[in-house]
């Protein structure tokens, strides 16, 4: 059954596009949050910005970056953090690198090692597959464009925890996998009381455990509940708060 709970935040403000959360923190949301329709984030500091994930293909990522143009005009994106290795959170990197060729990319070591497992060429081939297999695959991913995607591996990896300075703003990365995948990272902005969870949180949908163990996922929820926060940006679904974390933890 879906992980839905009255404690979760309302979907009333769940609209496609860029949402400002706090001064300099943004979420890019993609309803309905189903397979491939992931969220991303932008953290703007003094003269520079950090992107939390890209989207599933180049066209979607281009539209997202266009929506961020006003925020990044004087604060270019110089770093992207990958929350995990699945393509809906990083296949758009080439579009980001086209606009900012010197952009650095950061991921947990286990995330980097998993990134080669499902290349976009495989997804492109399955989108063209005949018969029931292709029909089923297109029912999930037929709206995405996997041709012409060039992947850029992370330029920096970390284990455990990494703190970054984004134009004077402290951004804390916590490796919490293996859980959803072999490597999962959450991104926390203490000043803004905001956390970007990647696919550690599916709000309004069922959490998918590709790696596990569940104990790690529950521990990740407990870690987030120990943070001073108001706003929670899930990997899929509408914005939530601490109650959304509790609901996912209790479901698991």
Predicted region positions:
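Accessory terminal helices/loops
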Residues: 2-9, 124-125, 136-141, 226-228, ...
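Conserved beta-strand hairpin/beta-sheet module of binuclear metal-dependent hydrolase folds
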Residues: 19-72, 185-198
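Divalent metal-coordination and catalytic microenvironments
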Residues: 24, 43, 53, 68, ...
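Active-site environment of divalent metal-dependent phosphoester hydrolases
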Residues: 37, 58-59, 85-91, 112-116, ...
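Active-site neighborhood of phospho(di)ester-bond hydrolases with catalytic His/Asp-centered motifs
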Residues: 52-54, 78-86, 106-109, 176-177, ...
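Active-site HxH/HxHxD metal-binding segment of metal-dependent hydrolases
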Residues: 70-154, 163
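Core dinuclear metal-dependent hydrolase active-site scaffold
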Residues: 149-152, 157-189
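Divalent-metal (often Zn2+) His-rich catalytic cores of metallo-beta-lactamase-fold enzymes
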Residues: 188, 194, 215-252
């Amino acid at each position: 059954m879906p992980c839905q709970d009255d404690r979760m935040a309302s979907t009333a403000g769940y609209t496609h596009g860029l949402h400002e959360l706090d001064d300099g923190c943004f979420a890019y949301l993609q309803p309905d949050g189903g397979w491939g329709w992931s969220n991303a984030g932008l953290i703007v500091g003094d003269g520079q910005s950090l992107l939390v994930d890209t989207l599933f293909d180049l066209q979607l990522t281009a539209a997202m970056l266009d929506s961020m143009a006003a925020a990044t005009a004087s604060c270019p994106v110089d770093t992207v953090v990958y929350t995990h290795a699945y393509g809906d959170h990083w296949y758009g990197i080439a579009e980001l690198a086209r606009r900012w060729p010197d952009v650095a990319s950061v991921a947990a070591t286990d995330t980097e090692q998993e990134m080669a497992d499902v290349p976009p060429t495989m997804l492109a081939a399955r989108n063209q597959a005949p018969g029931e297999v292709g029909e089923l695959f297109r029912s999930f991913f037929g709206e995405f464009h996997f041709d012409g995607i060039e992947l850029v591996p992370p330029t920096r990896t970390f284990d455990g925890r990494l703190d970054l300075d984004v134009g004077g703003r402290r951004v804390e990365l916590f490796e919490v996998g293996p859980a959803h995948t072999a490597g999962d990272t959450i991104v926390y902005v203490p000043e803004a009381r905001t956390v970007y969870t990647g696919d550690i949180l599916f709000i309004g949908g069922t959490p998918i455990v590709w790696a596990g163990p569940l104990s790690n996922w529950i521990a990740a929820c407990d870690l987030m509940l120990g943070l001073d926060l108001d706003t929670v940006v899930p990997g899929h679904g509408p914005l939530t708060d601490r109650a959304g974390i509790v609901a996912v933890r209790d479901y698991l």
